[in-house]
């Protein structure tokens, strides 16, 4: 992050602007909207600035710039076409630890002006850190179109009701949940439509409803890795959470989307490492919900596909805890799509089968004859440690040893790796593949070379290192 976004209160604070032309005019208009005490240093003023000076909306010094003018101001803006003067202003401000902006010269700026969407008191600021101003402007225009013009009334009303709410709703969590209901319900739609009286009545009705004592559990699929694959409903859920229990498969970019003051607790499991037993995870979820919290159980991929999500919701149901399920993009769909491997294709596969290689020792064995059929794609989760057995059994039950296979590691992530070969090479391919990894068996794998779009690839012949750098 090149710049820290800040909102500065400039009301009655002195701001020095060097320059009196059109460049300065644009900045001064924003400063006056923020009620700053604008001091202009320029030999002449544009007609618009001269009018503002005549109306005493700003003060004007028709003198040359001197370093001492920077001593008693809050911000400094150089808005001239004189490069030497701009350099002097920057040096003087920097030496006195004043924030300074030299218009259209990022190297001489300790702060930059963002593009602004003004729904006061609600403000949205967009910045490209000076890299792409046009992109910032385009984003601002899109956000302008999305946000209703009356949106600021919601914030004004919230400010009015805040102190009153503290006497009715005594905990921070209760107040937050109240505002989440209000801002997504009838009150918000009425206020945005301009019907303030009915909106206030709707808010009072919501306040008179009894606060629930029990929270809820929302089981959310985080997708296979790429934060862009998190569903909109999933994003809404993690933005509402009081506490998020997540596993190791949830990537950091997804976790960064969680509400900032939500508690994050890792309950993941990894082979060979200490992990939280499933029954303890179930208990943690139930206890948090019984405390009145909105609990999100965030799982990589889809929570109902080899994710043990159903077991956790069974515990919730037995405890009488309300719950929801937000599906996610499962690894077999996401990783193969990013690797350019379609799960089905009219010429190669009329079905796709998902199986797990991490099965319970006392469970019934696979129907290998069914799994070994041709004209189908086999996607195997958590199968790298059983790759030798999987390969041997499939070949023994009739699958051609030259059937194309792929091992997709860290699917949909920036460091995704796709290694291809044949079924008889599967053990070798999977041996040192980075985790998590998905095994894919089927003729559709041969389309990878033609359809791969996200990352480079490696073949069995070139795979002789513990980690293949495919970037």
From Swiss-Prot:
Phosphoserine modification sites are: 128
Q: Which UniProt keywords apply?
A: Cobalamin biosynthesis, Lyase, Methyltransferase, Multifunctional enzyme, NAD, Oxidoreductase, Phosphoprotein, Porphyrin biosynthesis, S-adenosyl-L-methionine, Transferase
Instruction: Spell out where the chain crosses the membrane.
Output: none
Active site positions, chain numbering: 247, 269
EC number of this enzyme: 2.1.1.107, 1.3.1.76, 4.99.1.4
* A Pfam family recorded for this sequence: NAD_binding_7
* Catalytic reaction list: uroporphyrinogen III + 2 S-adenosyl-L-methionine = precorrin-2 + 2 S-adenosyl-L-homocysteine + H(+); precorrin-2 + NAD(+) = sirohydrochlorin + NADH + 2 H(+); siroheme + 2 H(+) = sirohydrochlorin + Fe(2+)
Q: Which InterPro entries match?
A: 4pyrrol_Mease (IPR000878), 4pyrrol_Methylase_sf (IPR035996), 4pyrrole_Mease_sub1 (IPR014777), 4pyrrole_Mease_sub2 (IPR014776), CobA/CysG_C (IPR006366), NAD(P)-bd_dom_sf (IPR036291), Siro_Cobalamin_biosynth (IPR050161), Sirohaem_synt_dimer_dom_sf (IPR037115)
PROSITE patterns in the cross-refs: SUMT_1 (PS00839), SUMT_2 (PS00840)
Biological process GO terms, please? cobalamin biosynthetic process; methylation; siroheme biosynthetic process
Region listing for Precorrin-2 dehydrogenase /sirohydrochlorin ferrochelatase, in residue ranges? 1-203
- Binding residues annotated for NAD(+), in chain numbering: 22-23, 43-44
Where is the region Uroporphyrinogen-III C-methyltransferase?
A: 215-471
Q: In which pathway does it act?
A: Cofactor biosynthesis; adenosylcobalamin biosynthesis; precorrin-2 from uroporphyrinogen III: step 1/1; Cofactor biosynthesis; adenosylcobalamin biosynthesis; sirohydrochlorin from precorrin-2: step 1/1; Porphyrin-containing compound metabolism; siroheme biosynthesis; precorrin-2 from uroporphyrinogen III: step 1/1; Porphyrin-containing compound metabolism; siroheme biosynthesis; siroheme from sirohydrochlorin: step 1/1
**Which GO MF terms are attached to this record?**
NAD binding; precorrin-2 dehydrogenase activity; sirohydrochlorin ferrochelatase activity; uroporphyrin-III C-methyltransferase activity
Ligand binding (S-adenosyl-L-methionine): 224, 300-302, 305, 330-331, 382, 411
HAMAP family to which the protein is assigned, alphabetical: Siroheme_synth (MF_01646)
What is this protein for, i.e. what is its function?
Answer: Then it catalyzes the NAD-dependent ring dehydrogenation of precorrin-2 to yield sirohydrochlorin. Finally, it catalyzes the ferrochelation of sirohydrochlorin to yield siroheme.
Family membership: In the N-terminal section; belongs to the precorrin-2 dehydrogenase / sirohydrochlorin ferrochelatase family.
NCBIfam families, A to Z: cobA_cysG_Cterm (TIGR01469), cysG_Nterm (TIGR01470), PRK06136.1 (NF004790), PRK10637.1 (NF007922)
* Name this protein carries in UniProt: Siroheme synthase 1
């Amino acid at each position: 992050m090149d710049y820290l976004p800040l909102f500065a209160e400039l009301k009655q604070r002195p701001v020095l602007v060097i320059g009196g032309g059109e460049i300065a005019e644009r900045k001064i208009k924003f400063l006056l909207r923020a009620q700053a005490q604008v001091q202009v240093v320029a030999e002449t003023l544009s007609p618009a600035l001269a009018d503002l000076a005549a109306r005493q909306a700003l003060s004007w010094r028709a003198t040359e710039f001197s370093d001492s003018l920077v001593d008693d101001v809050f911000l400094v803006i150089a808005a001239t076409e004189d490069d030497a003067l701009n350099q002097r202003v920057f040096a003087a401000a920097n030496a006195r630890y004043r924030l300074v902006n030299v218009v259209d010269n990022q190297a001489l700026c300790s702060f930059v002006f963002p593009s602004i969407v003004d729904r006061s008191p609600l403000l949205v600021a967009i910045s490209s850190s000076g890299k792409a101003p046009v992109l910032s402007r385009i984003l601002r225009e899109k956000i302008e179109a999305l946000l209703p013009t009356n949106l600021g009334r919601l914030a004004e009303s919230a400010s009015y009701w805040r102190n009153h709410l503290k006497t009715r709703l005594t905990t921070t969590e209760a107040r937050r949940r109240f505002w989440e209901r209000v801002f997504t319900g009838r009150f918000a739609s009425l206020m945005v439509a301009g019907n303030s009286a009915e909106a206030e009545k709707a808010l009072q009705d919501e306040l008179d409803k009894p606060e629930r004592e029990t929270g809820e559990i929302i089981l959310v699929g985080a997708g296979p890795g790429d934060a862009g694959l998190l569903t909109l409903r999933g994003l809404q859920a993690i933005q509402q959470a009081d506490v998020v229990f997540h596993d190791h498969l949830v990537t950091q970019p997804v976790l960064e989307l969680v509400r900032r003051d939500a508690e994050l607790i890792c309950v993941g499991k990894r082979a060979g490492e200490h992990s939280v037993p499933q029954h303890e995870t179930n208990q943690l979820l139930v206890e948090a919900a019984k405390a009145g919290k909105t609990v999100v159980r965030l799982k990589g991929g889809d929570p109902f596909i080899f994710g043990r999500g159903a077991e956790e919701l069974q515990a919730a149901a037995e405890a009488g805890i309300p719950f929801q399920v937000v599906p996610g993009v499962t690894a077999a769909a996401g990783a193969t799509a990013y690797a350019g491997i379609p799960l089905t294709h009219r010429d190669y596969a009329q079905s796709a089968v998902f199986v797990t290689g991490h099965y319970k020792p006392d469970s019934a064995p696979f129907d290998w004859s069914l799994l070994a059929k041709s004209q189908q794609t086999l996607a195997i989760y958590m199968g790298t440690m059983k790759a030798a057995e999987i390969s041997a059994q499939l070949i023994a039950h009739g699958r051609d040893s030259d059937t194309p296979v792929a091992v997709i590691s860290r699917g949909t992530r920036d460091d995704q790796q796709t290694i291809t070969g044949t079924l008889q090479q599967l053990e070798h391919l999977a041996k040192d593949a980075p985790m998590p990894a998905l095994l894919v068996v089927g003729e559709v794998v041969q389309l990878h070379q033609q359809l791969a779009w996200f990352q480079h690839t490696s073949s069995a012949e070139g795979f002789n290192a513990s980690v293949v750098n495919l970037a």
